[in-house]
UniProtKB/Swiss-Prot annotation:
Pfam families: V-set. The gene is IGKV1-12. Immunoglobulins are composed of two identical heavy chains and two identical light chains; disulfide-linked. It comes from the Eukaryota. Residues 72-78 are annotated as: Complementarity-determining-2. GO terms for biological process: adaptive immune response; immune response. Residues 23-45 are annotated as: Framework-1. V region of the variable domain of immunoglobulin light chains that participates in the antigen recognition. Immunoglobulins, also known as antibodies, are membrane-bound or secreted glycoproteins produced by B lymphocytes. In the recognition phase of humoral immunity, the membrane-bound immunoglobulins serve as receptors which, upon binding of a specific antigen, trigger the clonal expansion and differentiation of B lymphocytes into immunoglobulins-secreting plasma cells. Residues 57-71 are annotated as: Framework-2. This is Immunoglobulin kappa variable 1-12. Its main location: secreted.
């Protein structure tokens, strides 16, 4: 059975703090992915300036609160399946789903935690 479904897997979270000396923009790519169950999916996130490893990844499904998947760039939150992994530091980060499952079709966000207004 062909499980290929156009799905919005990714979201864009732009963090911009006007008037701050440490404005940080987060840009995800690609903006959307069409994927099948079993596929390896990679999402990238780039910070406009270095944030060390202060990055988290979230999953959100319609009508639900965001769920923390990865914190400190590569640490798996308790209870999150090991098919999710994170890597990177500085400005470039990656979220990988090693084998996409039906329940993984969702929107994914990165969030920096290096600076706040």
């Amino acid at each position: 059975m062909d499980m290929r479904v156009p799905a919005q897997l990714l979201g864009l979270l732009l963090l911009w703090f006007p008037g701050s000396r440490c404005d940080i923009q987060m840009t995800q790519s690609p903006s959307s992915v069409s994927a099948s169950v079993g596929d390896r999916v990679t999402i990238t996130c780039r910070a406009s300036q270095g944030i060390s490893s202060w990055l988290a990844w979230y999953q959100q499904k319609p009508g639900k609160a965001p769920k923390l998947l990865i914190y400190a760039a590569s640490s798996l939150q308790s209870g999150v399946p090991s098919r999710f992994s994170g890597s990177g530091s500085g400005t470039d980060f990656t979220l990988t789903i090693s084998s996409l499952q039906p329940e993984d079709f969702a929107t994914y966000y990165c969030q920096q935690a290096n600076s706040f207004p």
